[in-house]
Design a protein with these regions (language model features):
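Peripheral (often C-terminal) accessory segments that flank ATP-dependent C-N-forming ligase machineries
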Residues: 44, 73-105
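Residue-level preference for alpha-helix termini and adjacent loops
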Residues: 36, 56, 62, 66, ...
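ATP-dependent carboxylate/phosphate-activation module, predominantly the ATP-grasp catalytic core
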Residues: 1-32, 54-77
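A short glycine-rich, hydrophobically flanked beta-strand micro-motif that places a catalytic Asp/Glu
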Residues: 34-45
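Protein kinase-like catalytic core scaffold
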Residues: 49-52
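Short beta-strand element of the conserved SAM-dependent methyltransferase core
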Residues: 1-2, 14, 41, 98-103
């Protein structure tokens, strides 16, 4: 679940949401992707609406990996046969930025 986004995800939390899981299985059945992809959607009144599907690793891959799923290794090994892998639910990621200056003034 993306909590805050401005181009790149600023804050997110891992959650298992059955309606999203079913939607993603339907996307896989329809498009038969080979490799990683991410789905961007919004949920309104309990209904998910997809607005983007990206054939790449998500910018939140660090959260995925910290939650226990090494998506890069799975892609390289081609060992994943389908199904939802176990992951740590409720894990929160927050990004922050700062300005660094160096060199002559």
């Amino acid at each position: 679940e993306i909590i805050q986004k401005r181009g790149i995800t600023i804050s997110a939390v891992t959650r298992k949401v059955e309606v999203i899981e079913k939607l993603c299985y339907a996307i896989v059945d329809k498009f038969k992707p080979c490799g990683s992809f991410n789905v961007q959607l919004i949920i309104q009144d309990g209904v998910p609406y997809v607005f983007e599907i990206n054939p790449r690793f998500s910018t939140t891959i660090a959260l995925t990996m910290e939650a226990g799923i090494n998506e890069i290794e799975l892609s390289l090994s081609d060992k994943h046969s389908g199904g939802l892998l176990p992951f740590t639910e409720g894990l929160v990621m927050s990004r922050y930025y700062d300005q660094l200056f160096w060199g002559a003034k």
